[in-house]
From Swiss-Prot:
NCBIfam families: prfA, PRK00591.1. This is Peptide chain release factor 1. The modification N5-methylglutamine is found at residue 235. The gene is prfA. Methylated by PrmC. Methylation increases the termination efficiency of RF1.
Length: 360
């Protein structure tokens, strides 16, 4: 284990002793607000300190097993214990590194996933549809729920733009690194000469704000339009102006929803998306300022960043931020996205760990 990590963990162990003492004091116990605050910190510190205690125990076990290697009667058992202890120490160190990393407070939230067709005309819209299906299928394997909030269909299939709401545990934390430019290289169905075309889509992943996070929108700053919904929806569709579009006049940010059966429901969902987009704009501006100070591999999540290429003739997916190349493109497009997301998570954790080390 790196010295700076051990030093941080020793501080956690010391802090746990301090918190145990504080929680035993009568003046703390009689002040409920202070008691709750200290109890929350105690729970967080206990998780780290407990794993570190286990790590030190396995280090001691490993040292003891190595001493037994010189005893012929104990050597076989010692080798088994060494293998088991070394494997557990690797796992524990990985867990401890994660526990020490600063957490994004939005990680556990639901997310809005916005996919827009870019350069490439009809082929780009078809690819936007492919991406929407890929994320929907991955969500199903993760046990998440997906609903389409709004969709602008293309004449030959696919989407000019589609907004999905993905609900489940840890959705934003898992999908946040999908924001950016996605490029596809393939022979379009409409191509008669067999030439490979390059098209692009942009993806934006935004955490769904909760009631405490939600910004207050001044009604005077909003323009609300109603229109007839289009797309799937049975006989109800196009008979009433149930779809809602909301424009935030100060920023020009627009959100719409046509999935619900009532104008009231669509307005509520459109306002949720609008709040998320306004907050994402503020977040992107902050990230751009931070990126000017330090450039991370995984990137800022700006939709102008080209993050990934999907090459169908080669069956290849390449994520340019971490130089990851996988030759299992068809499986990935069917929702087998876990390996990509896990690699991005590990890369981001390595960045954060390096920042911790340089600050230590």
């Amino acid at each position: 284990m790196k010295p700076f990590l051990r030093s941080q963990l020793e501080r956690y162990a010391q802090r746990l002793e301090e918190l145990d003492f504080l929680l035993s004091r009568e003046d703390i116990m009689s002040d409920m607000a202070q008691y709750r605050t200290i109890s929350r910190e105690h729970a967080e510190v206990t998780q780290v300190a407990g794993r570190y205690t286990r790590y030190r125990q396995r280090e001691a076990d490993l040292a003891g097993a190595r001493e037994m290697l010189d005893d012929p009667d104990m050597a076989d058992m010692a080798r088994e214990e060494i293998a088991a202890a070394e494997a557990e120490l690797v796992q524990l160190e990985d867990e401890l590194q994660r526990l020490l990393l600063p957490r994004d407070p939005d990680e556990a939230r639901n997310a809005f996933l916005e996919i827009r067709a870019g350069t490439g005309g009809d082929e780009s819209a078809l690819f936007a549809g492919d991406l929407a299906r890929m994320y929907t299928r991955y969500a199903a394997t993760a046990g998440w729920k997906v609903e389409i909030l709004s969709a602008s269909d293309n004449e030959i299939g696919g989407y000019k733009e589609v907004v999905l709401r993905v609900e489940g545990d840890g959705v934003y934390g898992a999908l946040r690194f999908e924001s950016g430019g996605h490029r596809v290289q393939r022979v379009p169905a409409t191509e008669t000469q067999g030439r490979i075309h390059t098209s692009a889509c942009t993806v934006a992943v935004m955490p769904e704000p909760d009631e405490q996070q939600a910004i207050t929108l001044n009604p005077a700053d909003l323009r609300i339009d109603t229109f007839r919904a289009s797309g799937a929806g049975g006989q109800h569709i196009n008979k009433t102006d149930s779809a809602v579009r909301v424009v935030h006049l100060p920023t020009g940010i627009v959100a719409e929803c046509q999935d619900g059966r009532s104008q009231h429901s669509n307005k509520a969902k459109a306002l949720q998306v609008l709040q998320a987009r306004i907050q994402e704009k503020e977040r992107s501006e902050r990230a751009a300022k931070e990126a000017a100070l330090r450039k991370g591999l995984v990137g800022s999540g700006d939709r102008s960043d080209r993050i990934r290429t999907y090459n169908f003739p080669q069956g290849r997916l390449t994520d340019h931020r971490i130089n990851l190349t996988l030759y299992k493109l068809l499986a990935i497009m069917e929702g087998d996205l876990g390996e990509v997301l896990e690699a991005l998570r590990h890369a981001r954790e390595a960045e954060l760990l390096a920042e911790l080390e340089s600050a230590a």
